[in-house]
Amino acid sequence: PVSRALAVDLASVAGPLTADPSAAAIFAPGGVPLTEGGRLQQSDLGGTLAQIRTVGVGDMYEGLLGHKLAEATAASGGPITVSDLRNARPALAPVLSRDAGHDHIAFLPLPADGGVAAAAAFGVLAHDPSAMQAAGAASEAVAARFRAQGGDAGTLLSQGGTAPGLPALPASTSFVVVDRKGGAVACSLTLNNLFGTGRVAPGTGILLAASPAVKPPPLLGAAIVWNENIHAFKAAIGGSGQNAAGLAVASVLAQAETSGGMSPVPDPGRANAVICAQYLPGEPQSCQFSTDPRGSGLASGGSQ
């Protein structure tokens, strides 16, 4: 069923999205955008995911699925080639780590500048939890500085001062998942625009992302808090909300390290979080599963 959040987004981009036949067939069958509670069918995407599941993810990068995707994007006016897919493999990178009392915080590493943006905002809030405006300014300033001149996280965070803010940034979203043993994932992702280019690669069900060369990339914000001494998890946060994504993450982090709760983050930021004040594994009853009601998201959890 179509969620309220998806229905609102579909209504806001109905014109551009229905201009693409493949996208219109999915999101606006009969020429009318799907509404809340409507039935969303994505058979082509289901086939693509089934192929990845049965053949392996390598098929996306170097196999038949990669060739199919390259041909489909060409038909939609996209520039993706098989060579692009082959060279675009995911990679591991050391996190940006900061101490918070007895805990450690892992922020996203550069070039995902939402990590330094969140770290800068948290640095302000750690000294004054009420200084939201100053934290937001610090968040945007450090990200703008990185985009203008590059540099490493330590240098960027130590420079301080003010800098011009960021232009209006595109949409992103986030999710967090935690198991009862404290294994955690915090993920922030984007199509560089709401519904990306608004085009679906024919036969694949895959929405094509907008090029970061055309639009400024969003701030991708996520963080995980753990205690190394007791080998335990404390919190996982995902932030979104265009320019306020970094502040959203930092605001929840500050609450996790003080009250252990989660109040709404400053607009237009949104956050999804799992906070276990007494850590995992060990005290599952201390965990809160929270999503911002303004984002029409979903949060659920149990101790079994």
Spans of features found by a protein language model:
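Proteins synthesized as precursors that undergo proteolytic processing into mature forms
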Residues: P1-A24, G46, G114-G150, L166-Q278
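Cofactor-pocket helix-loop regions in the catalytic cores of large enzyme subunits
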Residues: L34-Q41, T48, I52, G161-V178
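Secondary-structure transition/turn motif
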Residues: L110, S240, S290-P293
